[in-house]
Amino acid sequence: MMNTLEKLELLSENCSDRTELDRIIGQLLSIILTRHRQKLAIYDQDIKKFEQTYKLDSNQFIQQFEAGILGDEMDFFEWFSLCELRQDILVKIGKLEKAL
């Protein structure tokens, strides 16, 4: 089985020109971007549920959570993790959008 780098080299060798290779890579990046946007929508829905349940927006929540003001409820750890995942995916989306 070929590793990823070998597959990329094979793809590069078999494309007729750089324009074709750029188009193929662009299509792959677009697929990844779509998946990331779908994940973001799920994270946003889940975060919104926490905000409604605790009547607190996520920015206020993060400040209070990091300051130790809130308790150790499992919900708070899940909410915080979702906020971190959301931030990470936003960075990835931004990079992909710049590349496309």
Task: Describe the predicted segments one by one.
Residues 22-25, 29, 36, 65-68, ...:
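Amphipathic alpha-helical coiled-coil segments and their boundaries
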Residues 1-52, 59, 91-100:
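Small, basic N-terminal interaction modules of short regulatory proteins
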Residues 72-100:
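Short, compact, well-ordered microdomains
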Residues 50, 54, 60-62, 75-79:
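Amphipathic, hydrophobic secondary-structure cores in small proteins
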